[in-house]
Amino acid sequence: MFRGVTSISIDNKGRIAIPTRYRAELREQHEGVLVCTVDIRQPCLLLYPLHEWETVEQKLLALSNFEPMQRRIQRVMQGFATECEMDAAGRILLSPTLRQHAQLEQQIMLVGQLNKFEIWQDKQWQSQIAEDLALGGSAEMLNCEALKNLSL
């Protein structure tokens, strides 16, 4: 399970270093292979261990090619999906296309989301998290049915 937020630098080749605490698990359980794609709702990237991505692929495969919205989701999620193999130093290469989508520059935020990571441009992450925290006491959140029984 991936959790927490880590600030990471991107080198001049577009590589990021996966935090040390995740490397052994990713190598042992996922052969050090991850899949990176775009988030269709946010200006960030989604980084899945290979086995988790295979589950996502099955869900994408189950969508209809004849429904325009479902086909769009397949096209974007699968079309941008790129395998990233960790090197000996625990780094992965993010393609220029993926970096451009998320407007990634020198500093990024790697955000653990249980079975995957989100990769954000630093300033966009700060803005998004401020917006998310402000929503905490809003009527919209208080009236959300899915959250009414959530006990933390």
Curated annotation (Swiss-Prot):
GO terms for biological process: negative regulation of DNA-templated transcription initiation. Keywords: Cytoplasm, DNA-binding, Repeat, Transcription, Transcription regulation. PROSITE patterns: SPOVT_ABRB (PS51740). InterPro entries: MraZ (IPR003444), MraZ_C (IPR035644), MraZ_dom (IPR020603), MraZ_N (IPR035642), MraZ_sf (IPR038619), SpoVT-AbrB_dom (IPR007159), SpoVT-AbrB_sf (IPR037914). Its main location: cytoplasm. Gene3D superfamilies: Transcriptional regulator MraZ domain. The keyword Hydrolase does not apply. GO terms for cellular component: cytoplasm; nucleoid. It holds the Pfam family MraZ. Residues 5-52, 81-124 form the SpoVT-AbrB domain. It is found in: Cytoplasm, Nucleoid. GO terms for molecular function: DNA-binding transcription factor activity; transcription cis-regulatory region binding. Signal peptide: none annotated. Belongs to the MraZ family. NCBIfam families: division/cell wall cluster transcriptional repressor MraZ. Forms oligomers. This is Transcriptional regulator MraZ. It comes from Actinobacillus pleuropneumoniae serotype 5b (strain L20). The gene is mraZ.
